[in-house]
Curated annotation (Swiss-Prot):
This protein's encoding gene: mRRF2
SMART domains: EFG_C
GO molecular function, one term: GTP binding
Originating organism: Drosophila erecta
Function: Mitochondrial GTPase that mediates the disassembly of ribosomes from messenger RNA at the termination of mitochondrial protein biosynthesis. Not involved in the GTP-dependent ribosomal translocation step during translation elongation.
Major localization listed first in the record, in broad terms: mitochondrion
Transit sequence range: 1-29
Annotated residues for binding of GTP: 40-47, 104-108, 158-161
Recorded family membership: Belongs to the TRAFAC class translation factor GTPase superfamily. Classic translation factor GTPase family. EF-G/EF-2 subfamily.
Biological process per Gene Ontology, one example term: mitochondrial translation
PANTHER family in the cross-refs: RIBOSOME-RELEASING FACTOR 2, MITOCHONDRIAL (PTHR43261:SF1), TRANSLATION ELONGATION FACTOR G-RELATED (PTHR43261)
Identification of the protein by name: Ribosome-releasing factor 2, mitochondrial
Residue ranges of domain tr-type G in the record: 31-310
GO CC annotation terms, alphabetical: mitochondrion
């Protein structure tokens, strides 16, 4: 190839060599990038861990503390007031000749959608465990999300300085509750002064951090022959044995080596990297972020064991030299307007570039920024594999795929292939929202529109019956944060109505009816006659009755008309007849339809919707209420009082398990309607000694008494 290039002349040869060197540089640059997310249960120490990473990487000059409200990644007023992460935030920092793009994600169940979108942008994750609690409810949730995205993982067992921390139990939880294969690279030990130190399994050394310089430096000392060294050598041998069963290259060396002691450390680390990126094992490290122990070695492990961008996302190779980028978050900046966070999957994004969303909308990138939470450094171009903030994108929404390709036929394919539309969980609560005055209505609608671009789990709808704007959200905290953000960011003091439970409805029995409607609109005759049936079915929402007597009629309907009938019919399922809940477990079956010439699609759609509403009233519906799964940890002497209170709340006790020496954990399912203010009640019953986590776990039928009570609540009579 080089010979051919020279034959075509020196100018072409120089261009070819420049292109080759440019490709090599880009590949080398990409290999040094690590895009990672930090996942955990609430209060496990994600944000503190992130703040330490920024400090030791030289990005910040002082340690950010959650309890002081001076963290970089928790920059929203609501986050600093409450001491929790609400929105995912992106930060970029250098570490040992690598560039780490890190996303700090929320731990609260109300903000699970934030985590889901962030995982589209990363190549690996660090899961932080609370060393005193092990695997908790939200840990299981975020782990399953990482499973869905097939992401390699590291475990960081935090808070190991605490006297009640239990490293062995945490590792056991990983095996039992997450069904994964952990490999321990470190073990905790106490120094002579009682401070937490770490024994390194691979290098057979002890790591001790210096608190005088806030943990910036640490000593690594080779262990002298002792019981500690013998135990650590056994752990190293177990690690080699475990990895050799998963990695052929290491297995060949082990077979030809006299002793495990002679297996080279670098060989072990390469085998561990291969096993981790292939998701065969999960390396486990430990430390204490608050006490400044173990963070540098965690960052080393991110560089060593988690994959580079080029090792994943090969599916996007089909874009060739075109740009492909995934929008994983949108934030609103007072000075710069909407800012779009994009993970660049292929190509290079430059300032002023024209991009097309997979929805077919053209956008122009006015400016590019490198992310550091709510601070930004302007750049001119960003390479494949990196994360960038784009300014000037006006119609792009979270979850969009951006590309420089303008081929129309590629839009539909990318929608199918790359799952553009995010899977938004059902709302758990809803409430009305009112502006402080009529003049503020437009400003409120604009604020809600912007918040929806940022947060797809926020539902905004208009109730034609009451004439109110209705919000749907993932929980009480979610709704409270939305109100607070509208006030602090948009200066609108909105009023939220009382929170209502998001009940669902299901039909009691099948029903069949025919609806014929004729009307003259603007001199044009509109006529529709339609026969529909509703039946119990959890599979398809809409189907055709292809029986011999109906098939000839259905064959005369054009595909566009069938689509209009389908859309109108399904829209009626959004509001059931009893409490306005979504109708589920129901299928609409079209038997036949006759559409008059010149009848507008909107008239056909409205008739189909009216027909379904008539059917729902005829068949009757039953209510389904949301059920929550709770994990309650409390001292053993408080358990009886807590369980007595739960029984009054229609709760189902699934299990009571020991949790340490003094505590027990109650696993329980309870209706959401019975849990209003439960966290306060639990504090009272347990005298502040109990803790609780809660997450949705489906819907359940109700008896007639509870249904009547739910209807009265929905009507504002309770």
């Amino acid at each position: 190839m080089l010979k051919c290039a020279w034959q075509n002349g020196p100018r072409q040869s120089n261009r070819w060599l420049w292109q080759l060197s440019n490709q090599i540089w880009k590949r080398s640059y990409s290999s040094k990038i690590r895009n990672i997310g930090i996942l955990a249960h609430i209060d496990a120490g994600k944000t503190t861990t992130t703040e330490r990473m920024l400090f030791y990487a030289g990005k910040t000059r002082a340690l950010g503390e959650v309890h002081r409200g001076n963290t970089v990644t928790d920059y929203l007023t609501q986050e600093r007031e409450r001491g929790i992460t609400i929105c995912s935030s992106a930060v970029t920092f250098p570490w040992n000749d690598h560039r780490i793009n890190l996303l700090d994600t929320p731990g609260h169940i109300d903000f699970t959608m934030e985590v889901e979108q962030s995982l589209y942008a990363v190549d690996g994750v660090v899961v932080v465990l609370d060393g005193t609690a092990g695997v908790e409810a939200q840990t299981v949730t975020v782990w399953s999300q990482a499973d869905k995205h097939k992401l390699p993982r590291l475990i960081f067992v935090n808070k190991m300085d605490r006297p009640d921390a239990d490293f062995v139990k945490c590792v056991s939880d990983l095996k039992d509750k997450l069904e994964t294969q952990p490999v321990c690279l470190q073990y905790p030990v106490k120094n002579e002064d009682g401070q937490l130190a770490i024994n390194d399994v691979i290098h057979l050394e002890r790591l001790s951090w210096q608190q005088k310089d806030l943990g910036r430096s640490y000593k690594n000392v080779k262990l002298e022959p002792s019981d500690d060294l013998r135990q650590l050598q056994e752990k190293r041998n177990e690690l080699i044995d475990q990895l050799s069963g998963l990695d052929d290259e290491l297995a060949d060396v082990v077979i030809s080596t006299e002793s495990f002691d002679k297996v080279d450390n670098a060989l072990i680390e390469r085998a561990l990297r291969r096993a981790t990126t292939q998701q065969k094992v999960v390396p486990v490290l430990l430390g204490s972020a608050y006490k400044n122990v173990g963070i540098q070695r965690l960052m080393d492990a991110v560089n060593s064991y988690l994959p580079a961008p080029e090792e994943r996302n090969q599916i996007y190779d089909c874009f060739g030299t075109e740009v492909a980028g995934k929008v994983f978050k949108i934030v609103h900046d007072k000075q710069r307007g909407p800012l779009t966070l994009v993970r660049i999957l292929r190509g290079e994004i430059k300032r002023g570039m024209r991009l097309i969303s997979a929805r077919g909308q053209a956008e122009v990138v006015s400016k590019l920024y490198e992310p550091l939470a709510d601070e930004y450094r302007e750049v001119s171009a960003v390479q494949s594999g990196d994360v960038v903030i784009c300014a000037g994108l006006k119609s792009t929404v979270t979850g969009d795929l951006l590309t420089s390709s303008e081929e129309d036929d590629e839009f539909d394919e990318s929608h199918e292939l790359f799952a553009i539309d995010p899977q938004i969980p059902d709302a758990v609560y809803f409430c009305s929202i009112e502006p402080p005055s009529v003049s503020s209505q437009t400003a409120m609608e604009q604020a809600l529109k912007q918040l929806q671009r940022e947060d797809p789990s926020l539902r905004v709808s208009y109730d034609s019956v009451t004439g109110q704007t209705v919000l749907g959200g993932m929980g009480e905290l979610h709704m409270d944060i939305i109100k607070s953000r509208i006030l602090s960011e948009y200066k609108i003091d909105v009023d939220l109505g009382p929170l209502q439970i998001a009940y669902k409805e299901a039909i009691e029995s099948p029903a069949l009816t025919t609806l014929s409607v004729e009307k003259e609109i603007a001199g044009s005759k509109q006529s529709v006659s339609i026969t529909l049936e509703v039946v119990k079915n959890q599979a398809e929402l809409f189907s055709l009755d292809k029986s011999p007597e109906n098939l000839p009629n259905l064959n005369t309907l054009r595909p566009r008309i069938l689509q209009v009938l389908r859309k109108g019919s399904i829209s009626a399922l959004e509001r059931g007849p009893r409490v306005g809940g979504q109708v589920v477990e129901t299928q609409i079956r079209l038997h036949n339809a006759t559409i008059g010439r010149g009848t507008a699609d909107s008239f056909v759609m409205a008739t189909a919707s009216q027909c379904v509403q008539k059917l729902l009233s005829t068949s009757g519906t039953r209510l389904l209420e949301p059920i929550m799964a709770l994990q309650i940890v409390a001292p053993s002497e408080r358990i009886s009082g807590i369980m007595a209170d739960l029984s009054r709340r229609r709760a189902l006790i699934n299990d009571v398990l020991p949790k340490g020496e003094r505590n027990k954990m109650i696993l329980v399912n309870a209706p959401l309607a019975e849990l209003s203010g439960y966290s306060s009640a639990l504090r009272t019953i347990s005298s502040g000694t109990a803790s609780m986590t809660m997450q949705p776990c489906g819907f359940s039928s109700m008896n007639s008494v509870d249904e009547s009570l739910a209807e009265r609540r929905a009507q504002g009579l309770e």
